[in-house]
Amino acid sequence: IYDFKDAYLRYGTVKKLAVAQEKFKAMGYYIKIWDAYRPFAAQEKLWQVCPNPRYVANPANGMKAHNLGGTIDMTLVTFDGNEVEMPTGFDDFSLKADRDYSDVPETAAGNARMMERVMTECGFVGYAGEWWDYSDTTAYEACDFEP
C-alpha cells in the first residue's frame, strides 16, 4: 500500500502521543505504531484490497481519518519488544476487533480498555470497529503529500 516506511503525523498529534507514551512507559509499555498518515493514493489502493466501509474508508467520500495525519493504528509492547495481548491481531477484519470486548479473553479486553483509557486522557478517540485505531480529537485540514 505504501511506498515509504516511516510514520507521519501532525505535530499536535505527535505531542499528544508523546504524553501517552510517558504514561504507558510508567506502566512498563511502549507504543508500537502500525499505521499513521496515509496518502490519498494509498487509501485508494487499500479500498481496492478491502472495499468494506466498516474497515476501510471509501475514498469516493473524500479524505478521512488517516488521510488527515491525526490517526494512528497502534498497540503496546513490553520493554523487550513483545506485543501485549490484545483482542485480535492488527487489521483483523472481524467483529472480535471491535470495542465490545465481550467475545475475547479478559486479559486482552483489559489491556485494550487500559490503552483506550490512556489514549482518551491524552486527547484521542477510538474508532468503534477497531481496537487499535485512535484519532486526535483536534480537527485538521486535509493534506495530501507523498513522503
Name each model-derived stretch.
Residues 1-147:
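Cell-envelope/glycan interface and biosynthesis
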